[in-house]
Amino acid sequence: MKRIFISLTALVLALCMCIGLCAGAYADGTAPVAENLELQTYQNVSVGGSLSAYDPDGGALEYTITTEPVKGSIKLENDGSFVYTPRENKKGRDYFGYKAADADGNLSQEATVIIKIEKPKKDVLYSDMRGRADEYSAVLLSEKNIFTGEQIGGEYCFGPDKNVSRGEFLSMCMLISGKPLLESAMKTGFADDENIPSWMKGYVSTAAMCGVAGGGEYGEAFEAQTPVTKSEAALMLDRAINVTTVSYIPLDEALDADIAQACANLSACGVMDDAIGRNGEYLTRGEMARMLSAAIKLTENR
């Protein structure tokens, strides 16, 4: 009986030690989980993205490229954002691998980022967008016949820091929406109709009829030539592509209710960062390209 008692005691102690060790390992946290990604770009066109991983402890993560791409190069920033640039005239599929590490040095399994490099239909490459994260977005707008920048001295320039007018942005939103245009429209119904270019009136009239377009600062005038603000752009795009209304994202009470809802809707489907809508600054072409390229992908995948 004594031997049995000693054996049982030893067993209990062993179990306690195991439980203690397990509890300690759990308290120290577990390895992050890195996500696989897929991207598209065109030959000789850079594309940006962000590495993503989940840390069970909610701590900060560091990212490391563990497998280099074959057909291009990667520039990785500390926050996980990156720019992939394909080598000259390369096409097809490429990939690279990465791992995420937490503050304790725990490493995730290797995740992969797959890049599909396609041949463009047009010969449009922007000299002022080379190597930028939003170069692909700018070229995509031209490929889809939404917007093409200026050609100066035989080279295309996108002008990523230029402002976008209300009329230009609304017209692009309507093109992406796929709504039939009132091409024969001669009047838009806005007080400043005479200031709206003739080529734009079909877009503005259709948008007004569909509830996409509203007046500018003074309501009755559309103000087509006025630069569009980021919050106005969010509202126009949300209405144009009929994004699902979400209720699980808290609305910013500092914004008008319809703008706050538009920002939440577009944020939920990855079209824009909802923080953009809180900014009263004017929308730039670079920001426009990122928003509209995401909207194109969203509408095409419906």
Labelled PLM ranges:
Residues 1-12:
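Positively charged n-region of N-terminal signal peptides that target proteins for export
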Residues 16-19, 23-28, 37-42, 114-135, ...:
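Feature responds to low-complexity, polar/acidic, surface-exposed segments characteristic
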Residues 26-57, 63, 96-121:
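Extracellular interdomain linkers/hinges and stalk-like, low-complexity segments
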Residues 56-59, 68-70:
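Short glycine/proline-centered coil/turn motifs in the loop regions
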Residues 66-79, 150:
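Low-complexity "stalk/linker" and mucin-like segments enriched in Ser/Thr/Pro/Ala/Gly
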Residues 80-84:
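Short strand-edge motifs at loop-to-beta-strand transitions and within beta-strands
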Residues 88-92:
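Surface-exposed, short loops/turns at beta-strand junctions within beta-sandwich domains
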Residues 142-143, 204, 208-209, 267:
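Alpha-helix C-terminal capping/helix-coil junction sites
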